[in-house]
């Protein structure tokens, strides 16, 4: 949710939920530190406010790390509230929200799963049975070095290796 007008944003999101519901579809609400829904707590509160059965929370591992979501917080969320997990790793360092790296890393400098400083295992093991995982790993430098196809292959390879090593 990017608009500063929360009422407008809520009404528009509710309209999308209602339209999607007509077709049996669900929507995912992603929290992003530099948006108007910056964290898990805010996303869940927004979902409660909208009271739509077809909206779920999307957990992006980079964003969750940056807003210091704990494994305990994830474990406390009912399984049916999770819709999607965006997988990537990233630097352990958490920049201030107005620092260029806050947006820069998110949009073009994410790291391969298991190759950064995020406690991915702690996070992923505490999200009860998410229906979907998706690798979201924009990294301009890796694409320039490896090419798009090899970058995509490496994204999948590192995720599979990480999941096997951590029994996820």
Regions inferred by a protein language model and the residue ranges of each:
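Hydrophobic faces of well-ordered beta-strands that scaffold small-molecule active sites
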Residues: 1-2, 27-29, 55-59, 82-87, ...
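Active-site acidic/histidine proton-transfer and metal-coordination neighborhood
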Residues: 1-57, 66, 166
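Catalytic metal-binding/acid-base residues of hydrolase active sites
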Residues: 32-33, 62-63, 91, 138
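C-terminal helical cap(s) of enzyme catalytic domains, especially alpha/beta-barrels
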Residues: 145-168
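A generic structural signal for short
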Residues: 4-5, 32, 62, 111-112, ...
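Gly/Pro-rich active-site loop or hairpin
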Residues: 40, 65-130, 142-150
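A structural motif corresponding to the C-terminal end of an alpha-helix
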Residues: 19-24, 122-130, 161-168
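A general structural detector for well-ordered alpha-helical segments in enzyme core domains, enriched
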Residues: 12-16, 42-46, 73-74, 119-123, ...
């Amino acid at each position: 949710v990017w608009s500063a007008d929360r009422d407008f944003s809520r009404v528009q999101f509710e309209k999308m939920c209602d339209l999607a519901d007509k077709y049996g579809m669900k929507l995912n609400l992603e929290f992003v530190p530099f948006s108007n829904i910056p964290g898990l707590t805010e996303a869940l509160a927004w979902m409660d406010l909208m009271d739509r059965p077809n909206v779920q929370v999307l957990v992006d591992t980079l964003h969750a790390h940056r807003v210091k979501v704990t494994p305990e917080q994830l474990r406390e969320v009912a399984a049916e509230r999770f819709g999607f997990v965006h997988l990537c790793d990233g630097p352990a360092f958490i920049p201030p929200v107005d620092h260029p790296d806050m947006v820069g890393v998110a949009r073009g400098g994410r790291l391969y799963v298991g190759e950064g400083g995020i406690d991915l295992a702690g996070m992923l093991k505490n999200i009860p049975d998410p229906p979907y995982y998706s690798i979201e790993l924009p990294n301009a430098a890796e694409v320039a070095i490896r090419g798009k196809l090899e970058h995509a292959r490496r994204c999948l390879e590192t995720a599979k290796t990480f999941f096997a090593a951590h029994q996820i």
